[in-house]
Amino acid sequence: MKRRNFVQNSVLAGASLLTAGLLKADPAAAATTAPDTGKPFHLNYGIHDGMFKNHAGDDFIDQIKFAYDQGFRSIEDNGMARRPIDQQKKIGDTLAKLGMAMGVFVQPGLGNDTNLLASGKAEHLDKFIASCKEAVEVAKRINGKLVTVVPGDFVRNLPIGIQTGNVIEAIKKGTAIIEPHGLVMVLEPLSDNPDLFLRTPDQAYAICKAVGSPSCKILYDMYHVQRNQGNIIPTLNWVYDEIGYYQIGDNPGRKEPGTGEVNYKNIFKHIYDKGYKGVLGMEHGNAIKGKEGETALIKAYRDADSFM
């Protein structure tokens, strides 16, 4: 082979190898350097601990910083009240420095099946009142304004109207504690099991109207709405003036948008058009493990958020 041809062929071969290498590059790395990386989303989606641990490590603060670099501007943390106080403060400081918002945390000391407000019993009411006071202190450390409350299970030996009245009275007492501090409890209708008292947004709507406080609103978790009844957009419209927060999760599977049957792109556009400016909590898992799954999650939100 002539030297000139050898050089040309070598250059072409090298270019081919380089191209192949680029095509085989780590898709996770590619996603974090995409053209829209860092650009804020149209809506304010809130990540949770563990969502980006493969990219950023186990430290939640490092995950928050990574999420910020990907365009996310808020977090939620169900277990915030269980974290050490110094960690709560560090998370709050990190959010403040980055200009990020704090979504919901779950009211301390309450479980889905242990907070029996429907019973009307003093022991459950006292525990609830104490948890409201503790929630105020947690919120101060993290500059939070939203706390998730679940009334607990049905009490089978009481008529439903009596149970509803008991829940309303308990929530009134709770809002009297948190309202002076600008805190809002968001009541979450759930689909986890048939024993739960609060299951539908219209039921939560009636309770909020009866309580009559700006510190009592609905947590509109679209995963639970889809499982319980569907009809997400019309139901949203019916209860919109009492919605204080949204949570996301596709169904079946409770993973990121695009992995199930819910048309989140249309729903996000509807929420945006309604003028909502708050946080939408990403209360779901990652459909795929590892960095690849985290990259797929980011892309899923970019796709669902591309409604403009």
Kindly give the residue locations of the regions a language model identified.
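Histidine-acidic metal/acid-base catalytic patches
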Residues: K2-N54, D58-Y68, L198-Y220, H224-M308
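Catalytic domains of carbohydrate-active enzymes, especially glycoside hydrolases
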Residues: D62-M80
